């Protein structure tokens, strides 16, 4: 009898402790959410606007747009090694970070890879001519020849590889974009496209094909759950498919401007108008809510993977 009472007493203490932890974490998450709503609730996100270029200072910032091969390269065969851009890429980011007299410094962000840039700038009658060079140590390094038209505030130009790679030339068309982390911004429903050369001209890892199929078969819940502002509880996570969990986890990283190496994820998020690749490491930028959700999602992804083997 005494033993039973003792066990009951211990159980009540443990339940009380758990309840305090739950309330403490819940309050912490709610405080984080309230702070986010106050901070990020504004009518329009700055990164949808494009700034006029009137002088060199206006050029500093992120220039985002297409990085595509000329038509003559469209049927070329390539192997996706996780570093090379494909024939068609929707979003390259040429980030101009510093201009001093006629010298320019910055970085290029494409296909989950960041490369340093150095070069020169020359003012012309209708804009600015810019030449930017990558170091040349990597297989896919090259030179950018760009023109900023002050009448349209757009960059157009070309990229030429140093080495004799399969896709040696590229055309660029870029607009200035302003990156702002906004956890409240919703996901838009998009369908992942199949490039003309997707399976015919590309040799890729088997995991990429699986990833394409996963992205194409997610549910409506991906658009209803915002993993940056609300805690995903175990009951909710258990009801989600492995595909849903994978996308929700990566939505968190995309909102921080993570530059995806895996092309299926890249083209999915590049279809979102708010997405801008700015970094290959955003772990230090994650909020408390996002970190908690990533832990939960990873746990249930492993659970789904384990049970799919049986």
Question: Where do the protein language model's features map onto the residues?
Answer:
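Amphipathic alpha-helical packing elements
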Residues: 236-277
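C-terminal motif of bacterial Sec signal peptides marking the signal peptidase cleavage site
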Residues: 16-17
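Sec/Tat-exported extracytoplasmic proteins
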Residues: 67, 71, 249-252, 256, ...
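Compact alpha-helical subdomains of small soluble proteins
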Residues: 260, 267-310
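Positively charged n-region of N-terminal signal peptides that target proteins for export
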Residues: 1-5, 20
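Acidic/histidine-rich, surface-exposed loop or edge segments in extracytoplasmic proteins
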Residues: 223-234, 276-279
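Beta-sheet ligand-binding and adhesion/scaffold domains
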Residues: 22-79, 83-93, 107-113, 117-206
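Sec-dependent N-terminal signal peptides
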Residues: 5-13
């Amino acid at each position: 009898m005494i033993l039973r009472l003792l066990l009951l007493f211990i159980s009540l203490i443990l339940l009380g402790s758990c309840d305090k932890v739950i309330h403490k974490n819940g309050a912490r998450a709610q405080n984080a959410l309230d702070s986010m709503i106050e901070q990020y609730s504004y009518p329009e996100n700055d990164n949808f606007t494009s700034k006029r270029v009137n002088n060199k200072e206006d050029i500093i910032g992120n220039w985002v747009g297409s990085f595509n091969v000329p038509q003559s390269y469209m049927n070329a065969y390539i192997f996706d090694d996780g570093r090379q851009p494909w024939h068609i890429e929707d979003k390259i980011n040429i980030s101009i970070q510093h201009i001093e007299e006629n010298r320019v410094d910055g970085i290029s962000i494409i296909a989950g890879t960041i490369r340093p840039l150095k070069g020169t700038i020359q003012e012309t009658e209708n804009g600015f001519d810019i030449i930017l060079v990558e170091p040349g140590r990597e297989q896919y390094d090259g030179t950018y020849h760009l023109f900023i038209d002050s009448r349209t505030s757009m960059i157009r130009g070309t990229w030429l590889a140093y080495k004799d790679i399969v896709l040696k030339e590229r055309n660029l068309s870029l607009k200035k974009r302003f990156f702002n982390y906004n956890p409240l911004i919703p996901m838009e429903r998009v369908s992942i496209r199949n490039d003309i050369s997707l399976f015919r001209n590309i040799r890729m890892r088997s995991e990429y094909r699986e990833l394409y199929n996963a992205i194409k078969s997610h549910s409506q819940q991906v658009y209803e759950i915002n993993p940056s502002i609300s805690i995903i509880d175990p009951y909710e996570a258990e009801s989600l498919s492995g595909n849903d969990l994978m996308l929700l986890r990566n939505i968190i990283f995309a909102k921080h401007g993570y530059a995806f190496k895996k092309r299926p994820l890249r083209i999915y998020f590049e279809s979102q108008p708010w997405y801008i690749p700015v970094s290959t490491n955003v772990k230090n930028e994650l909020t408390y809510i996002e970190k908690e959700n990533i832990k939960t999602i990873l746990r249930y992804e492993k659970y789904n993977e384990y049970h799919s083997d049986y």
